[in-house]
């Protein structure tokens, strides 16, 4: 389970303070990167991006994420997510909205991780995406999760 963000002010302070320490100690907030794990072992690194978020493959964030994956021997991905029905660019998601996910492999480990589509532009359903998350862990999605996602 993911935890709710509880430390925005602390993190904003540290981010600003780090800039004061000089150009020769660069650091960055890696946005919304999750370590997908199973039994305390990392399975993949995923940077989740909203459908309106910018993806720049030459950015320091993406290049660093790719390098982290390579160094750890883990697949690294960008997963863009969106909804079929949303109120404005960053607005509330409508209750009848259908979520979609786009899985973009970043390194060689990711290209061999059983991505549900060979087309980086393909949008997959939430069920397909969550099934893939279970498969990354060598597991089968439980039927109760399938039933909940099919409602």
Question: Model features per residue range: what roles?
Answer:
Residues 27-29, 41-43, 60, 71-73:
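Short connector loops at helix/strand junctions that flank enzyme active sites
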Residues 25, 52-62:
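Active-site-adjacent loop/helix micro-motif of nuclease/hydrolase catalytic cores
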Residues 94-151:
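Helix-rich interaction surfaces within compact, conserved domain-sized segments
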Residues 1-39:
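Active-site metal-binding core of divalent-cation-utilizing nuclease and nuclease-like domains
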Residues 69-103:
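Nucleic-acid nuclease catalytic cores
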Residues 32-34, 40-52:
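Conserved catalytic cores of phosphodiester-cleaving nucleases, focusing on short active-site segments
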Residues 47-50, 59, 80:
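Residue-level recognition of conserved beta-strand positions in structured domain cores
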